[in-house]
Amino acid sequence: IYPIMEPYAGVASLDVTKALVDQGYDELKMTQTAESFFTSLGLPKLPDSFYENSLIKKPADRDVVCHASAWDIDNGNDPRIKQCVEINEEQLSTLHHELGHIYYYLMYKDQPSVFKGGAHDGFHEAIGDTIVLSMTPDYLKKKGLIDEVEVSYEATINKQMKLALEKIAFLP
């Protein structure tokens, strides 16, 4: 719906998808890019089992449900995601969101089980969504996915409208 509601058409339209394709990103590189966000905050690298056991590319030999999800299989020792990653901006955001869940699992893995449930069902989702809010134009520029960061009133309003349509409309 954003394309028909964009307040200032064409202002600060960031074509991250084009950059991902032009730079030869694949499912693994996109996942590693999302992981690098967390390691840049001082969090540990994901365990090798994450990459061995996660489904990030749609298998050609069988049907799977491609809805993205994060899993804590063995009390934080075998975190996984299931996401049929496509090379586009939305999927890059979804990877950051899903890895938000994974890092949350990793951070509470040593807590007693009574403390592993969220205070509210929406809390876990809020963790992932908060991470996506950090995917600012400055962040995308540092990752080499955009050339310039346009700072203007119009660009700010467009970004806020897009965010409102993607996130705020779905709040309970």
Task: Go through each PLM region and give its residues.
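Cation-handling catalytic/transport regions enriched in His/Asp/Glu
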Residues: 1-172
